[in-house]
């Protein structure tokens, strides 16, 4: 196991790793311990009482954070005709059809989000091996397969994030930057937490919100009390 750096060791001394903090307090600590020379991303990890081996307990979706993530996303839209024009008008960075398919097959991946109209999925589906492993494949569950391409582009540009349980039932997601005001981080956190509470699977047994940990890119994790949401 790699040895911790001095900065991380010093950061850990600023709080009790065994204490469960209220969200606002935890986020203030994360901001204080974000000492890297770049604007660190603030991330949250929810360990949920779900069993991802069961399809109905595999959580996946998207939510628009009220204050965005602090990252400008490059958006690609697969569409034709009027829908292509709608996507361009909404601010999509790249819009196309078969031409974009060929570009991606040639190795180009200069985008963060891919959106497609349903009629284009026959074409886009051929990119599954390229886009799937990178989390870039358009999917109805995340609102990226839709005829409402204008809304989808605006959401993606305006702070929409996707979430998905991993193999052990943890959801990792960014909720902003360390430079954000604490209150804005707290509101982004609450939006995501409320969404996860709302979509709790009916078949989930026992405690649903098991642990919540928030941290900056290079900082230590601070635990949030799930009962204080």
UniProtKB/Swiss-Prot annotation:
Matches recorded under PROSITE patterns: RIBOSOMAL_L1
GO molecular-function terms, A-Z: rRNA binding; structural constituent of ribosome; tRNA binding
Entry GO terms, CC: large ribosomal subunit
GO terms classed as biological process: regulation of translation; translation
Transmembrane segments: none
Alphabetical keyword list: Repressor, Ribonucleoprotein, Ribosomal protein, RNA-binding, rRNA-binding, Translation regulation, tRNA-binding
SUPFAM superfamilies per the UniProt record, alphabetical: Ribosomal protein L1
Function: Binds directly to 23S rRNA. The L1 stalk is quite mobile in the ribosome, and is involved in E site tRNA release.
Subunit and interaction comment: Part of the 50S ribosomal subunit.
Name of the featured protein: Large ribosomal subunit protein uL1
Native species: Desulforamulus reducens (strain ATCC BAA-1160 / DSM 100696 / MI-1)
């Amino acid at each position: 196991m790699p040895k911790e750096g001095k900065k991380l060791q010093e950061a850990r001394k600023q709080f009790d790793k065994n204490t469960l903090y209220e969200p606002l307090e935890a986020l203030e600590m994360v901001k204080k311990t974000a000492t890297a020379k770049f604007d660190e991303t603030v991330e949250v990890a929810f360990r949920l009482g779900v069993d991802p081996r069961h399809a109905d307990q595999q959580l996946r979706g998207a939510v628009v954070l009220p204050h965005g993530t602090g990252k400008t996303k490059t958006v690609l839209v697969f569409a034709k005709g009027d829908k292509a024009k709608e996507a361009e008008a909404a601010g999509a960075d790249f819009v196309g059809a078969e031409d974009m398919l060929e570009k991606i097959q040639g190795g180009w991946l200069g985008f963060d989000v891919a959106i497609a109209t349903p009629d284009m999925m026959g074409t886009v589906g051929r990119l599954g091996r390229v886009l799937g492993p990178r989390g870039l494949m358009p999917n109805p569950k995340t609102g990226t397969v839709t005829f409402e391409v204008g809304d989808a582009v605006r959401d993606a540009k305006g702070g929409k994030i996707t979430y998905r349980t991993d193999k052990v039932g943890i959801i990792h997601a960014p909720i902003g930057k360390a430079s954000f005001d604490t209150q804005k981080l707290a509101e982004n956190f609450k939006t995501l937490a409320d969404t996860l509470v709302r979509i709790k699977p009916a078949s989930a047994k026992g405690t649903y919100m098991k642990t919540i940990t928030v941290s900056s890119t290079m900082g230590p994790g601070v635990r949030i009390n799930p009962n204080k949401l």
